[in-house]
């Protein structure tokens, strides 16, 4: 029998993930509230009407609600009467007892503890209506509701310094360095950092690196929310959420991020109006002169030009800079959030994977721009070349601690290897010394003449510092299954293809490209140039307006979307996710498949929502490779992956026996995998014979012509 979730997915295939989570949460938590289908229509009908657009009228929405209401009633436990239910299959008690683990909660209990986060603004009306209904009926009965999935939140604690507290409270602390010592960060029961120290010197640019899931993003959030003590006089900005869409033009939105300038302009307008109306007092004229002086000091008149340069560098055309923010997609609004942060120039700028939202051109511009950044930056990035370009220092998060290194990423790699080698040598030397002393103690322990020497040696052992063996990070190894028979070309090609959604805006004209099982093709180009559209044409998800797509009859494509997280059910475990996608296989097979991509042990059983961005990507890879494709089409596969996994992914693709076409902005990854480089621009795709070096040189020359360098 179909569940309410199944009905929602079948009737509204385009339903937003947050709306889906909210509606299913209402259905399950408020099922006791619904005495009739009218109650259910009142609770979620209006929301479903918005989701359906014009595809369903009121009667259609009511019919869907009737199906879900019937499903809820059938799912209720029947404690009275002798109702008989026909089972789908016989129950084998012996197998149930074999699989039952007394220490493991039953699935039904687990679901009660799960929840989903919902966009409160978007669903405010529906929530208010449901709340009123629940309050009205609370006097009649006690409702048994299951709570929505609330993810664990991070917490931080740190040792306080009386001296720093006194300086802070007295206002005498004028330093812009950030020093946080002996602090802990936890995420639920997991300890991410223990007794850690972080020192951010003013004007330095720090790259924060480490494996997926260790707590880099959490550390940024702890700093941004000041859960870790950052001096109050230090302004900071954390680029995390996209800009809210409204009627404000993009350029004006950036200008408004400078609150000091906006406040001065507001004062200037108010004072000028008073003076013009003849209502000003003598002191207000002096105050206006003071405001003008301050505006001149911060070069307020040059602000629009500076904001425009930042927006242009991030890919906003002059026309786009005048568009209302509500007209931009989520990716462009994230760029807008980055532009606002760059324009505001905070004392401490916190960036979390800024290159994920950018194309190669914008990344190169950002590298150049940040190299002259006047204050402090802490950036989480897995883009090796980006860190080499902008970082003056590297902070390595591992083993629940933070280690600092001077220099860019390549310098960090060399220094880390030397440090580990020295630590190993010191550990081995001490172990050898301990063994030497222990041999003496064991030999003369019962010799009365040597008793004093034995005691001396024992004290010597006790005083030796306890050195731990070097904690080496495990090597990441990925392998794509390739147990398939190779076949002859042509494999996949587009011939003279035209494509557009609107005839007035042609995306591709007479596009001709081809790929075979030996291909290692990387597609680059500015955002909006049509890279993802071309991938969908190659896959057959989009049909050409004119022209032909040829695909070999044995071709089996595996597709990785840059929006893969949106396509995962975040409320179930990775094992359950694969079981739903590929039913009928033993659990060990799902676990083995996930283990290939580093999702093993308890990670495989945790809700996908609780995994880090990189771990979610690994789950998506496990799902993509389960059917053993012979050709991969990958759209930004390195987003959120740590450097070791990116490296392993590159080697896995090189060893794969099938074909690969991918879109990426990661320079090192492109150089590692790419045999052909295609540039997507102006409605066509061009092969660059000189590879990435030639493409980078073309972009740098373009920057010089446009005055960015």
UniProtKB/Swiss-Prot annotation:
ATP 1 binds at residues 210-217. InterPro entries: AAA+_ATPase (IPR003593), ABC_tran_Xtn (IPR032781), ABC_transporter-like_ATP-bd (IPR003439), ABC_transporter-like_CS (IPR017871), ABCF_EF3_subfamily (IPR050611), P-loop_NTPase (IPR027417). The modification N-acetylalanine is found at residue 2. One of its GO terms (biological process) is defense response to virus. Residues 178-424, 492-707 form the ABC transporter domain. Transmembrane segments: none annotated. ATP 2 binds at residues 525-532. Pfam families: ABC_tran (PF00005), ABC_tran_Xtn (PF12848). GO terms for molecular function: ATP binding; ATP hydrolysis activity. Residues 129-171 are annotated as: Disordered. Residues 129-143, 161-171 have a biased composition (Basic and acidic residues). It comes from the Eukaryota. Keywords: Acetylation, Antiviral defense, ATP-binding, Nucleotide-binding, Phosphoprotein, Repeat. PROSITE patterns: ABC_TRANSPORTER_1, ABC_TRANSPORTER_2. Gene3D superfamilies: P-loop containing nucleotide triphosphate hydrolases. The modification Phosphoserine is found at residues 155, 157, 161, 283. Belongs to the ABC transporter superfamily. ABCF family. EF3 subfamily. Displays an antiviral effect against flaviviruses such as west Nile virus (WNV) in the presence of OAS1B. This is ATP-binding cassette sub-family F member 3. It comes from Rattus norvegicus (Rat).
């Amino acid at each position: 029998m179909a569940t309410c979730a199944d009905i929602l997915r079948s009737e509204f295939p385009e339903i937003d993930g947050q709306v889906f989570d909210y509606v299913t949460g209402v259905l399950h938590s408020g099922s006791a509230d619904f005495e009739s289908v009218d109650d259910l229509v009142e609770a979620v009908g209006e929301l479903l009407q918005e989701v359906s657009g014009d595809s369903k009228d009121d009667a259609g929405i009511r019919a869907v609600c009737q199906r879900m209401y019937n499903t809820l009633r059938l799912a209720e436990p029947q404690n009275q009467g002798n109702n008989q239910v026909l089972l789908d299959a016989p129950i084998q008690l012996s197998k149930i007892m074999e699989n039952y683990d007394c220490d493991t909660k039953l699935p039904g209990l687990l679901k009660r503890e799960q929840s989903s986060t919902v966009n409160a603004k978007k669903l405010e009306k529906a929530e208010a209506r449901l709340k009123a209904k629940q309050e009205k009926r609370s006097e009649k009965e006690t409702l048994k509701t299951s709570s929505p999935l609330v993810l664990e939140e991070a917490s931080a604690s740190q040792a306080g310094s009386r001296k720093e507290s006194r300086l802070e409270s007295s206002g005498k602390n004028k330093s812009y360095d950030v020093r946080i010592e002996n602090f802990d960060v936890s995420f639920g029961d997991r300890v991410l950092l223990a007794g850690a120290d972080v020192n951010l010197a003013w004007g330095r640019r720090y790259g924060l690196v480490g494996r997926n899931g260790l707590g880099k993003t959490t550390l940024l959030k702890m700093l941004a929310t000041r859960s870790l003590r950052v001096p109050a006089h230090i302004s900071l900005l954390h680029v995390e959420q996209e800009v809210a869409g409204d009627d404000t033009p993009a350029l004006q939105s950036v200008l408004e991020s400078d609150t000091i300038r906006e406040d001065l302009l507001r004062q200037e307008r108010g004072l000028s109006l008073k003076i013009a109306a003849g209502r000003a007092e003598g002191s207000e004229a002096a105050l206006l002169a003071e405001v003008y002086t301050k505006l001149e000091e911060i070069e307020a008149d040059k602000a629009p030009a500076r904001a425009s340069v930042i927006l242009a560098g991030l890919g906003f055309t002059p026309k786009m800079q005048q568009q209302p923010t509500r007209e931009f997609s989520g990716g462009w609004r994230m760029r807008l959030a980055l532009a606002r942060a760059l324009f505001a120039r905070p004392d401490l700028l916190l960036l979390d994977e800024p290159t994920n939202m950018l194309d190669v051109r914008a990344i190169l511009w950002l590298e150049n721009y940040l190299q002259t950044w006047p204050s402090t930056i802490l950036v989480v990035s897995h883009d090796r070349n980006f860190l080499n370009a902008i970082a003056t220092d590297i902070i390595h998060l591992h083993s629940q601690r933070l280690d600092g290194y001077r220099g860019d990423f390549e310098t960090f790699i060399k220094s880390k290897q030397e440090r580990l080698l020295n630590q190993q040598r010191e550990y081995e030397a001490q172990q050898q010394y301990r063994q030497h002393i222990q041999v003496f103690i064991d030999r003369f322990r019962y010799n009365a003449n040597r008793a004093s020497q034995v005691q001396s040696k024992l004290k010597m052992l006790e005083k030796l510092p306890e050195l731990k063996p070097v904690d080496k990070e495990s090597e990441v190894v990925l392998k794509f299954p390739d147990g398939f028979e190779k076949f002859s070309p042509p494999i996949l090609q587009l011939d003279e293809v035209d494509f557009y959604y609107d005839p007035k805006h042609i995306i591709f004209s007479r596009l001709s490209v081809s790929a075979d099982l030996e291909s290692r093709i990387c597609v680059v180009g500015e955002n909006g140039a049509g890279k993802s559209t071309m991938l969908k044409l190659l896959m057959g998800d989009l049909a050409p307006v004119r022209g032909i797509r040829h695909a070999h009859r044995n071709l089996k494509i595996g597709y990785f979307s840059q929006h893969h997280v949106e396509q995962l059910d975040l409320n179930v475990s990775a094992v359950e996710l694969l079981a739903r996608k590929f039913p009928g296989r033993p659990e060990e097979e799902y676990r083995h498949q996930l283990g290939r991509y580093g999702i093993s042990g308890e990670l495989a059983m945790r809700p996908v929502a609780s995994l880090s961005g990189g771990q979610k990507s690994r789950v998506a890879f496990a799902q993509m490779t389960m059917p053993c494709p012979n050709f991969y089409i990958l759209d930004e596969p390195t987003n959120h992956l740590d450097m070791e996994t990116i490296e392993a992914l590159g080697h896995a693709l090189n060893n794969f026996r099938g074909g690969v076409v991918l879109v990426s902005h990661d320079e090192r990854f492109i150089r590692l995998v790419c045999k052909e480089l295609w540039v997507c621009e102006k409605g066509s795709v061009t092969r660059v014979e000189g590879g990435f070096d030639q493409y980078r040189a073309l972009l740098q020359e373009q920057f010089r012509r446009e005055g960015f360098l």
